[in-house]
Each structure stands twice: as structure tokens, then as C-alpha cells.
Design a protein with these regions (language model features):
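Beta1/beta-strand and adjacent pyrophosphate-binding region of the FAD-binding site
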Residues: 1-11
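Conserved hydrophobic helix-helix packing surfaces used for dimerization/oligomerization
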Residues: 5-7, 28, 269
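N-terminal Rossmann-fold NAD(P) dinucleotide-binding loop
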Residues: 14-15
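Glycine-rich FAD pyrophosphate-binding loop
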Residues: 22-41
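A conserved beta-strand/loop capping segment in the N-terminal third of enzymes
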Residues: 47-106
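Predominantly flavin-linked oxidoreductase catalytic cores and closely associated redox partners
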Residues: 110-242
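FAD/FMN-dependent oxidoreductases across multiple families
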Residues: 125, 217-300, 306-309
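C-terminal helical "tail/cap" subdomain of flavin- and related membrane-associated enzymes
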Residues: 299-425
Length: 425
């Protein structure tokens, strides 16, 4: 492949794209002044994400820990409430956790081993014209024939060549690293205000604990940290910690309408991972989709029309699933549904299996509702149908839930298409 590629950002998307392209003979330059670094997320890497990078990243390459179970706490409002936790056991290798700094460093090492070069400088501007790309750092300009923006939610490449994310398209993850303690269990505490959940994710030598809220939901980072501290105290998730280190980070959180009109690429450039908005709106997990988008551009640059080919591939491997998650998001965190879910986890082994697969990345949103309904006992199924109808009436008056013999059917007059927009639009 005779191609000069400039990649802004050395996270999973950028490093994996660099590895794949350099391996094919492209001349690849990665620009990032500070990678590898920790990322304020859970740190979990699903089995399907590990499978994507298995050829370049052997299992022995990372200091990692395997999650054995997930504990789900009862619904809380702005204050903690009492209730019974439900525990879901996970298969071995269903979910592993690693330091994001170590994971990113391993991918970057693989890219450099394949022939990519790293320029440890901050990119201050990019220019695209009909003949070439210019990437500007404080020390001068670098030129290429194709530009990849893999520089996160605050992507400079996105701001210059597409549209910056609006506030309502972002969420804020805020919390603490709890040093000096770890475990082999995820802990999730559902909350109704803001709608979502608190989490405690173990890493090899500490816990990542936090909460996520839409950026336009009216909560400051300080308020979210206070709620996290209250939960840490109430749930006892960080007993024995030696130090709490605060963090805060923006994460894309798009609606179904946003995904239908997503900015992915244009002539001689594309966006990957968080920079493209390829993050699950429910779990805020983006590593798998970042890696798959990197694979998409590596394959598309061999095509006659790389932009169209890339856009098609991303819609096939990511957008359809993410748009479904976006359509489910508000209903998923409704108090009535959360209470039903916790009851089902307590009473149904089938539902616990579904949740384990969802955590591990094996369960798609496309079949989630029907698999849940099929696994429920008769009494829970009746409650589920009633709950879904109530949520539909209260939150989605334009949608109808109807029953036909043997199944439930959801219809909608405002369902967004899963087909890609015009390339370069």
C-alpha cells in the first residue's frame, strides 16, 4: 500500500489503525504528545474487543485481571437507599480489566513494531486540500495524503473538518481512582437523578469509581463527585483504599437521530472511535467500536472510493447497533424498568445469563428485548409487558406497544433509519 497517512491520536483507534496500515506497507505517522495515559473509564475490555487485537496483542502482553461477577445495587434517587443487591456470575475471560495506559502502550508498541512512527507533539491545526494534508504542530508542518482523526471527544480534527459535538451530544464521566484496593467484581448502582448508574470497576492495582451524566442534564462535575463519594461510603466499594484521585472526562453520547446523520469522513480524511461518536449510549463503552472503525478504514483505503467504503463498513459494524442502544437508552433507565430488571435478576437464571452476555459484549441490543422476554417466567413476562406499556405511554406517546399471539410488537412513527447517510455529507 503506497500511501502516506497521518493519524492524530494514539489511543486504541489510532494505534490499531496505524498497526493495520503500517503492516500493509503504508507510511504512517502518529501524532500524540502524551500517550499512553490513563483513561477515566471502567477500564474493562470485552472478550470481543480482545479478539479483534489478538494477533498483535498476545494475552500475556498485559498485566490484567479477570472480572468474575457483577453486582447490581437497588435504584437510588439523589440520596442512597436500602435494598438487596443482585449478583451476576461471569464466565472466565468474559471481561478483563487492564490499565488503559498499559493497554494503549501495548497497541502503540505493536504499531511502531509494524513500521509506524510517533511524533510526540501536540497538533494545533490541520488543513485538507485537493492535493495533500497538512498537520501543523508547534515545530512545523507535516504532510500526508490521508488524515485520520482519532483524537477523542474533543477532537481537533473533528472541529476543523466536520462539526464539534454539541453539549447535548456529550456526557461527562466523573469520579475517582481508589488506590490501594482492588477486587474481581464490578459493582453497579442504578440512580434516577440523573438517570443512569454509578460504577466501580476493578483494575489490576486500583478501582475506577464514577458516574456519568449527559452534559446538558444540569449537574456540575462537583455535584456528580459528591454523589459518587456518598455512594462509595454507602456501598462500601472502596474499603481499605489509601487515596482517592479525582477525574472528569467527556464521552460522546449520541441519539438515534445523531447516528443517522453522523459525521464520519470526507475527501482525504475520516474520524475514528470517540472522535466519530462511536460509543455505546447506554454503557458508554467505546473500545470495541474504536477498534472496528480502525479496521474499517484500513480496509477502505484499498477501495476505489475509500470514503464511501469506510462509511458503509462503519454502518454495518457499529452504527446500527449503537442507534438501537440510543433508542433504548431512556427506557432502559426508567425507574419502572430498573425495578423490573432487578427483580428479574433475582428470580430468573435466564435473565442473569442475558445480563452476563450484555456485560461481556456477546448480547446485541437488536435481540435484547426479545431474549429477555423469552427467558422470563410467566409472571415476570406479564409484569414486563405491563411495564413496557406504561413506559411507552409516559415517555413515548408517539410509539405504540401492541400484542399479537405469542409476541409483543413495538411500532414507532419516528424510528430513525439504520442506513448510512450520503458519504461526505
Amino acid at each position: 500500500m503506497k500511501l502516506d497517512v497521518a493519524i492524530v491520536g494514539a489511543g486504541p483507534a489510532g494505534a490499531w489503525a496505524a498497526y493495520l496500515l503500517a503492516r500493509e506497507g503504508a507510511r504512517v505517522t502518529i501524532f500524540d504528545p502524551s500517550h499512553p495515559r490513563e483513561k477515566p473509564c471502567g477500564g474493562g475490555v470485552t472478550g470481543r474487543a480482545l479478539a479483534v487485537v489478538a494477533d498483535a496483542l498476545p494475552a500475556t502482553a498485559l498485566d490484567r485481571a479477570t472480572i468474575r461477577s457483577a453486582r447490581f445495587g437497588p435504584l437510588r434517587g439523589s440520596a442512597a437507599s436500602a435494598g438487596q443487591d443482585e449478583v451476576v456470575r461471569l464466565d472466565a475471560e468474559a471481561l478483563i480489566v487492564a490499565s488503559r495506559a498499559a493497554f494503549d502502550a501495548a497497541l502503540l508498541d505493536a504499531a511502531r513494531g509494524a513500521g509506524a512512527s510517533l511524533v510526540a507533539e501536540r497538533v494545533v491545526d490541520v488543513h485538507v486540500d485537493a492535493s495533500r494534508i497538512a498537520v501543523q504542530t508547534a515545530r512545523g508542518a507535516h504532510h500526508a495524503s490521508f488524515l485520520i482523526g482519532a483524537d477523542g471527544a474533543n477532537s481537533l480534527v473533528r472541529r476543523r473538518l466536520a462539526r464539534a459535538f454539541r453539549r447535548d451530544q456529550l456526557s461527562i464521566a466523573t469520579g475517582f481512582y481508589a488506590h490501594g484496593v482492588t477486587t474481581d467484581e464490578i459493582v453497579v448502582g442504578f440512580v434516577s437523578d440523573p438517570p443512569g448508574y454509578l460504577w466501580s470497576f476493578p483494575r489490576p492495582d486500583h478501582l475506577a469509581i464514577g458516574i456519568c451524566a449527559q452534559a446538558d442534564a444540569g449537574f456540575t462535575s462537583g455535584e456528580l463527585r459528591d454523589r459518587t463519594l456518598a455512594w462509595i461510603s454507602h456501598a462500601g466499594v472502596a474499603r481499605g483504599h489509601t487515596r482517592l484521585e479525582p477525574y472528569s472526562w467527556p464521552i460522546p453520547s449520541l441519539s438515534a437521530a445523531d447516528f443517522a446523520a453522523i459525521d464520519l469522513a470526507g475527501p482525504r480524511w475520516c474520524l475514528l472511535g470517540d472522535a466519530a461518536g462511536l460509543v455505546d449510549p447506554i454503557t458508554r463503552e467505546g473500545i470495541y467500536f474504536a477498534l472496528r472503525s480502525a479496521e474499517s478504514i484500513a480496509a477502505a483505503l484499498r477501495a476505489a472510493d475509500p470514503v464511501r467504503d469506510f462509511t458503509t463498513r462503519v454502518f454495518e459494524t457499529a452504527i446500527g447497533e449503537l442507534a438501537r442502544a440510543a433508542r433504548l437508552k431512556d427506557r432502559f433507565f426508567q425507574p419502572a424498568f430498573v425495578r423490573l430488571l432487578l427483580r428479574a435478576l433475582r428470580q430468573s437464571a435466564g435473565v442473569r445469563a442475558v445480563m452476563a452476555d450484555l456485560i461481556a459484549g456477546r448480547q446485541t441490543y437488536r435481540s435484547l428485548k426479545w431474549r429477555l422476554l423469552k427467558t422470563l417466567e410467566v409472571g415476570l413476562a406479564i409484569d414486563a409487558a405491563a411495564t413496557l406499556r406504561r413506559v411507552q405511554r409516559e415517555k413515548y406517546p408517539s410509539r405504540a406497544l401492541t400484542r399479537t399471539p405469542g409476541r409483543l410488537t413495538v411500532t414507532s412513527i419516528d424510528r430513525q433509519p439504520d442506513s448510512p447517510p450520503r458519504a461526505g455529507a
